[in-house]
Each structure stands twice: as C-alpha cells, then as structure tokens.
C-alpha cells in the first residue's frame, strides 16, 4: 500500500488530478477525460476529423532532393 499506513474506505485517492477541460477550461470529469462533457469531447473530435488540427510542414527543397539519392 502507498504511504505505508492503514487505508480506510473514507480516504480514497483519485485516479488522476482534475485538470481544466482541453476545450472550454472547466474542470474535467473522469468519464470524458481530458474534457468536461461529451459535447466538448465531440467538438474536439470534429476538429480532428475535419482537418482543423494539422502539423505545419516547412517545405525545404534541398532536403527533399537529398532524400531521393541512396
């Protein structure tokens, strides 16, 4: 057991600390972590599926040419 002491039923440790919702900033809940609700979770999913989230890529032609030669 953690802490080396006795553990009673009234001293339950949460699985993780509450963090702000990744979408709106309200406290997250366990069922929808890291979001506060199903709505915020679905808004984020929609952004991923619609392509709103993208990793920017800088085109460097000199590196692209070097990659072709082996």
Curated annotation (Swiss-Prot):
Lineage of producing organism: Bacteria, Pseudomonadati, Pseudomonadota, Alphaproteobacteria, Hyphomicrobiales
Biological process per Gene Ontology, one example term: regulation of DNA-templated transcription
SUPFAM superfamilies attached to this UniProt entry: Glucocorticoid receptor-like (DNA-binding domain)
Top-level lineage group: Bacteria
Family: Belongs to the DNA gyrase inhibitor YacG family.
Keywords on record: Metal-binding, Zinc
Gene that produces this protein: yacG
Binding site for Zn(2+): 21, 24, 36, 40
Co-factor(s): Zn(2+)
Subunit-structure text: Interacts with GyrB.
Protein name stated in the entry: DNA gyrase inhibitor YacG
Signal peptide segment: none
Cofactor binding note: Binds 1 zinc ion.
Record-linked Pfam families: YacG
Function: Inhibits all the catalytic activities of DNA gyrase by preventing its interaction with DNA. Acts by binding directly to the C-terminal domain of GyrB, which probably disrupts DNA binding by the gyrase.
GO molecular function, one term: zinc ion binding
HAMAP family: DNA_gyrase_inhibitor_YacG (MF_00649)
